Amino acid sequence: MYSYNLNNFQYNNYNTVKTVKATPVENEQPAPQKPSFTSNPIKQVPYNAAFTASNLRTQLVSNDEKAKYNKLTQIADKNTRKNLNILLKTGVLLNSDSNDKSTTLDNLYLIATTQRAQGLDNAVLLHDTVQTLAQPHVVTQQFGNVPKQFMAKTVALGNGEDVNVEHSGTCPAASIEFNLAQKHPAEFARFANGLSSPEMSVKKTIKLSNLADNTLDAVWLLNAFEIPYKADNFNEAELTFAPDKNALVRAYFQTVDRDKLERSSIDVLMQSTFMNVGSQQSYNTLTDKRAGKFNQNPKGLIEFEKTFTESVVEDKNKISVTYQKIDENAKLVGYETDFATMKKQIVDALNMGDNVIIGYTQTDNTNTIVNGHEITIIGARTDKHGKMTFICHDTDDGQSKPVEYSEDFLLPKIHHAGLPQKVAEKDMQVKENWVEGLETYKQLKKQYKNVA
């Protein structure tokens, strides 16, 4: 995991403090859309590395597989049964691209038939997980209101009016969730099973080389982010992913009182877990606020935190490439590279089978950044005039389908992109992310002392 960043200020000034647009929790209509993009009805990305010809299975073979599938169809509602059939025919159900090689079917069976965390419902969890796998574009960051009958008890937890979250800061976590569902369905189902179980946690073995070239530097990162782990050798570590204690409260609300366009219980558990990882185990799901040593803002994740989280969730060496130059007054003053290089790097990553999570900014009439938001680029196409259109998933646009942005609109707004190491190293020198994190930590401590 690396970061390419020549200016510490631009690293600190970008943050998902606010979403670019949000639908109020009482509103069940899609947020108003600007004509900068158009809807795209596609359901799947053309290429997915998890489904190669060598491991694509679309037929139940063993008696165990048949028994599990039959049990699920007995439990499931009509829509879930339909989606299960789609997952089987497309190879998703029997995919075993998970950390422990369990299949999507194995984990869905556990979700449906074994005890869940208190207040969670097996049938609802099965429905939500299957729907997300069949249609990953349903992943959203819209919180939903606290049901009136639970407001007094929720406020008594010490969170007051902060529990009415209208503008979610979970776009980085929601983007990572979408990526996991679309690119690694068996692992998504494994996370859904573990996070909704009585233990409310998932263990995952990762390669330390996907965090840093040097083992000690990788261990520094794990310690800095305070994620529980066990390392018995210099090559791998077993990490424990878990949401904060209040995630179960929100997940219960979304189980019994979920409105249209709001997060599912699975969305809550996934996003709370990934926010907790990125915020150094300091996230509070009830208020959508965090603490942590790398960010002085209580909302969202900064670039460094998002890249760490993405790297450990996918167990891939991600490089955070920063494109925009931001001065100390949060003003956009230029770019680190030209748009042609930016476009080439994104397309190269897509051609490798990766989605690309980007952070983009909005500026006011003085070119000062006022908003930051994370979305996922899942594809691209070029017209006869050579102009490219990017196909994206936005977890905060009030739609359950892809959207399209022209290159002229999107490229100037991209602050950073999470790219595979092989892509970024072709065109630039990279700085390891643990170095970036240490420098930022020292800078924040210095700023705090000056204020104090």
Residue ranges of model-derived segments:
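Low-complexity, intrinsically disordered export/secretion signals at extreme N-termini
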Residues: 1-110, 126
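Short linear sequence motifs
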Residues: 2-7, 30, 40, 44, ...
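Intrinsic-disorder/low-complexity regions
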Residues: 4-7, 11-14, 26, 39, ...
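Serine/threonine-rich low-complexity intrinsically disordered regions
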Residues: 5, 21-24, 36, 40, ...
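Active-site signature of cysteine proteases
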Residues: 5-30, 42-44, 299, 305-452
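Active-site nucleophile-adjacent alpha helix/oxyanion-hole segment immediately C-terminal to the catalytic cysteine
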Residues: 65-97, 101-298, 357, 399
